[in-house]
Amino acid sequence: MITMENIVRDGHPALRETAEPVELPPTDAEKQQLADMIEFVKNSQNPELAEKYKLRPGVGLAAPQINIKKRMIAVHAEDASGKLYSYALFNPKIVSHSVEKSYLTSGEGCLSVDEAIPGYVPRYARIRVKGTTLEGENIDIRLKGFPAIVFQHEIDHLNGVMFYDHIDKENPFKEPENAIAIER
């Protein structure tokens, strides 16, 4: 079981490296790692388990955050209408995106970053993601709103990018042009 002790913190070199693709079919060890990742994200949202194991609530996790330099992500997040997007993916890739942007009005946080870093993080409003599930199914999904932001945040981790890299250093709360504000 993954706990907060397994999550590397900001400054760890794994967070700034480009993760390697997972050769498919994945090994049993890789499947177990990804299964553990989605279990962690789900557990972190369960108040009883989060308190018992001292988990910070999260909506996503990327393998580099547990010092595994492979292209694997787990996302468990709802959109504004309450639809659940729960995915554990090998080799996720954004294959297309909108010109229009979006951002969370509350800013973003990260399980690997202990302090709050204020500012707007511009993201694409809509994305299309391809990847392979734990069951070996190749998927092609279209995302918008909060789930699209979560996927972009996690896929950034696979490329050594942190959310605060996107924040305007001169004016952190400068509203991105042509962007939808998303409340969370």
UniProtKB/Swiss-Prot annotation:
Disulfide bonds: none annotated. Its cofactor is Fe(2+). It catalyses: N-terminal N-formyl-L-methionyl-[peptide] + H2O = N-terminal L-methionyl-[peptide] + formate. The active site is at residue 154. SUPFAM superfamilies: Peptide deformylase. InterPro entries: Peptide_deformylase (IPR023635), Peptide_deformylase_sf (IPR036821). GO terms for molecular function: metal ion binding; peptide deformylase activity. Belongs to the polypeptide deformylase family. This is Peptide deformylase 2.
